[in-house]
Amino acid sequence: MTTLMETRGATPTSGTTLRALTALEARRYARHPLFLVGVALLIWQVIVISQDAARAADGVSTTLVDVAIYPAFTLGLLGVFVGVHLTRSMARSREPIEASPTDGVNRVAAMCLACLVPGVVALVWFAWAYAVTAVWPLPATAMPSSSVAAIRGAGIVCAVGGPLFGVMVGRWTRFPGAGLLAAFVLFGWVMLSTGALAMSATRMSTLAHVWAPFVGWHSSDSVTGEAPWIAGGSPVWHLAYITALCGLAATAAMLHDAWGTQRARLIRVFVLVSVLALASLALAVAADPTRVPL
């Protein structure tokens, strides 16, 4: 009996195993060449924009309201490839944890948690965006500060969401080029929604704009960029919507390896998060479609 109790006590708990797996996957993510390329590109953009802001005679450009595209591309879109590659190569990193009992769902959950690595980098970028506008303030605008924060905060969510989408694709597909196809689908989805900015300001055009996982809010009626404006809709609720999309991607990825009651529980979570995503999208569209001049 004593031996049995000692054996049980020596067995790692599920939480301990998940932490060990997450640390392992986070290290793999942080060392991935494409992630490092994305970080380098983001740093380069930060340097260029900071120099432009310092040289500007009339203050910071209003386009700095809508700069989330930088982490969304360098960490999010490139992160799709990272997520697919690391998910498919998980088998190679099993050796260090062979002594720890685990299952496929735990391993995928750890991979999803590792996608917070680019989110941390994007969080540093978020702080930089506010530091720049604190030193060189933006021109006065009617846009509330919460909307500005939500537009910029989307960069953090996209930096995590792209890799999560890659993890999901990596679990459910096996054909070569799946990562490239997934990135192309995301890019096309965003480009399709951008076309709605050329439409008149209505709730239908707002829906066509904000249903994408990343949207550009800043535009102008002039080809020279004069008289810029921010598109209608609610950036805050759009942020909630894309956060829910991240939850859907993570849940769908874990569903691949789940069985029995675990699978049933994940399906319930998927349905609940789907409802939250649709509700957030509806609230984003329900906001005033009028464009806010900058």
Residue ranges and their predicted role:
Residues 1-89, 242-294:
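Hydrophobic alpha-helical transmembrane segments
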Residues 97-105:
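Short helix-to-coil transition segments within interhelical loops
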Residues 106-110:
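Alpha-helix N-cap/helix-start motif at helix boundaries, enriched for small hydrophobics
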Residues 177-208:
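Transmembrane helix segments
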Residues 9-16, 85-98, 155, 159-189:
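Cytoplasmic juxtamembrane interface segments
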Residues 198-257:
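Membrane-embedded alpha-helical segments of integral membrane proteins
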Residues 46-78, 82-83, 112-180:
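Secretory targeting signals
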Residues 42-50, 123-124, 128, 184-196, ...:
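Aromatic-anchored segments of alpha-helical transmembrane domains
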